[in-house]
């Protein structure tokens, strides 16, 4: 996923950062929009530190002190962009820009992220349907269900390939889904069948909750981590929609690609990283004091409460 190149000082390259809820993606595009460098990494909520590391790495390995056009996108990118003066572009707009550039015949985009889901209708104008208020039916939901089945997301995908039947499972909320999945586990249902049912639930949630009756047809594009990594999820969408969707090369990177294409302001990346250092040093956060000032205070509290108990009848 990574390719090095030697940059001439007269080259105009574009850098796009997509900072999502769980991952950070970065691309470098050449003068003709060719992909020169890309990376996809989890940030484990250390967004600031990971962004600084990436900016310095790209400068050292790719740009060698040269300026680059830069913009930032993603659900977790706005505050970071504001703090260092880099233009921010909304992720839906970034996706549309990249799709129009690299997959111009697309009629509809289905994108599942870590904690949100989107459908972009691109025919007869642009219409966006997005669920950003609940993680049901997203990558976080799939990870939660995989944990319930005591396997990784990759193992759950492989198990689902061997399914013989499916069950009805709610995906609007992980709590409701767990109340459907746990009884199936207790009753001895095949893990393979439960796994396939979970993917089917994601499909039903996306179509019913976002499409809301509007037909999904034509050239369908699948983007985002869950649809990139899960063959069963893509197949489930194909079967439900009666289409053959496309998961393009670099499907994980389309928001970052759109951010790079949108970029129109030059920066030295090490200077942006330094600006983030200054922001980190001066930022203040509103918070409540801890419940206990020390471990000893907590242990005293715990012992006091444990000394009182309701008599058993």
Locate predicted features.
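Glycine-rich phosphate-binding loop plus the immediately following alpha-helix
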Residues: 46-47, 124-165, 173, 252-255, ...
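Short beta-strand-loop/turn "lid" adjacent to the catalytic site in phosphate-handling enzymes
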Residues: 40-43, 58-93, 120-129
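Short glycine-rich, Thr/Ser-proximal phosphate-binding strand/loop in the N-terminal lobe
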Residues: 14-49, 53-57, 132
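Glycine-rich phosphate-binding loops at beta-strand->alpha-helix junctions
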Residues: 76, 211-240, 251-255
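Conserved phosphate-binding/catalytic loops in two-lobed NTP-binding clefts
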Residues: 88-92, 238-257
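Gly/Thr-rich phosphate-binding beta-strand-loop-beta motif of the actin/hexokinase/Hsp70
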Residues: 4-32, 106-123, 165, 313
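Acidic, glycine/GT-rich loop-and beta-edge segments that sit at the periphery of enzyme/chaperone cores
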Residues: 1, 265-313
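Adenine-nucleotide phosphate-binding core of ATP-dependent small-molecule kinases
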Residues: 177-210
């Amino acid at each position: 996923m990574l390719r090095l190149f030697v940059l001439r000082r007269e080259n105009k390259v574009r850098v796009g950062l997509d900072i999502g809820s769980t991952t950070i993606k970065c691309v470098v595009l050449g003068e003709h929009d060719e992909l020169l460098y890309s990376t996809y990494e989890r940030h484990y909520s250390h967004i600031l530190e990971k962004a600084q590391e990436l900016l310095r790495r790209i400068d050292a390995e790719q740009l060698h002190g040269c300026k680059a056009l830069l913009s930032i996108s993603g659900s977790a990118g706005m505050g970071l962009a504001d703090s260092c003066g880099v233009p921010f572009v909304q992720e839906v707009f970034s996706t549309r820009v990249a799709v129009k550039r690299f997959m111009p015949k697309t009629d509809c985009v289905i994108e599942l992220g870590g904690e949100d889901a989107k459908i972009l209708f691109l025919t007869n104008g642009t219409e966006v349907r997005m669920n950003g208020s609940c993680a049901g039916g997203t990558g976080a939901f799939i990870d939660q269900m995989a944990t319930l089945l005591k396997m990784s997301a990759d193992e759950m995908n492989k198990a689902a390939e061997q399914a013989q039947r499916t069950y009805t499972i709610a995906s609007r909320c992980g709590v409701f889904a767990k109340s459907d999945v746990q009884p199936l586990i207790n009753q001895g249902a095949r893990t393979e069948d439960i796994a396939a049912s979970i993917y089917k639930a994601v499909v039903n949630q996306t179509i019913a909750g976002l499409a809301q009756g509007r037909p999904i047809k034509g050239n369908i594009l699948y983007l985002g981590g869950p649809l990139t990594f899960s063959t069963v999820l893509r197949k489930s969408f194909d079967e439900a929609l009666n289409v053959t969707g496309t998961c393009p090369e670099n499907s994980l990177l389309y928001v970052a690609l759109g951010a790079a294409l949108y970029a129109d302001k030059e920066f030295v990346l090490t200077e942006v990283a330094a600006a983030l250092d200054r922001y980190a040093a001066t930022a203040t956060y509103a918070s409540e004091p801890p419940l206990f000032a020390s471990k000893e205070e907590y242990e005293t509290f715990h012992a006091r409460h444990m000394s009182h108990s309701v008599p058993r009848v």
